[in-house]
Every structure is written in C-alpha cells, then in structure tokens.
Amino acid sequence: MIPEGKNHGLIFVLDWSGSMSSVMLDTMKQLFNLIWFCRKVSIPFDVFAFTNEYNYMTWDENDKPVYPEPHYEKKDATLVVNDHFSMMNILTSNFNNRVLEKQMKSLHRIAFGFTKYVEYSVPNRMGLSGTPLNEALISLHNIIPAFKKQYSLEKVQCIVLTDGEAAPCNRHSEVTYPNGEVHLGTQR
C-alpha cells in the first residue's frame, strides 16, 4: 500500500459526442464529484474530452480553410485516425482553485446548454461530434506514460465516462489500380 495515495493518479476521459447531449449534465456532475475527491486527497488528475469537432476546421487571416495536420504516418494496415480527432485537456490538477472553479463552471454551463438544446451557448468548436472512442483509447498509450512521468506516479487509473459504443474504426489499405499505380485507401 502506498501511504496517503500520493503515488496514484487518475485520468478521466469524457465522451464529447452527440449521443451524450441528454446525459452530459449528469455525467459532468459525477465528474466534478470525482475531481473534488482527487483535490481533497491530493491525487493528481487530468480530464480529457474526445471529439471530432474541436479540430474540425479553422480559417486563416484571409478566411481560407486550414486543414489539420495528420496525427500519424498513414501506411498500409494501420488504423485510420480521423484528421479532426482531438483529445481536449479540459481540466487538470495543475489549476489553482480559482481557475479550476472557473473552468468547472464553464463546463457546467456548456453541459446545461446541451441538455436544453440551446446550441448558441456552446463556444465555437466545442459542439458535440461523433464518437471517436477507439481513437481516444489509442491516444492514451501516449498520454498515460507522460502523465505518469510528470507526477512520478506508480499507479495511474483511467476512467472513461461514455454512454456506449464507438464509431467504427477503419484501416488503411493499399490498392493497386489496373494501370499498376498503388494508392492508399481505407477499408472496414
């Protein structure tokens, strides 16, 4: 047993998809209870929300679309990760109490907006999207070791707050055209 739980850390992964709209407020309240517990017993935590919306589209100073950079090298037999996928780090134990409270109030307001279908209350690029749960779980292979190292932790637990099934994951597949050209496509 580790004294006082000082060598433990928690990562929360929140489903930021459209199907969560009716339960987002209750889910957010439960998340806040978990965060207050972590704060009280000094357990470091990070909260990520997975989405395809945040990184969806930006525009440059000339109002031309800027497409997101791919997250990885696309090659045969690798899983397809949507170019718009993002893990938004929305809360962290690094925040002081004032900043944490302000962020939690903002997230509560956004979640309330989802339940009442008041989309105008949702900040730009914070709307709900599809369900890139598989991509989120894959990204944890980088997030968890970095979190563990940052806080010199022995144990890191991950809690996923979701309402269910992930969007399907495709894989890259090389396709040879009749003229001999090889192209990279996708396949389920």
Language-model features: where?
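Acidic, glycine-rich A-domain
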Residues: 1-188
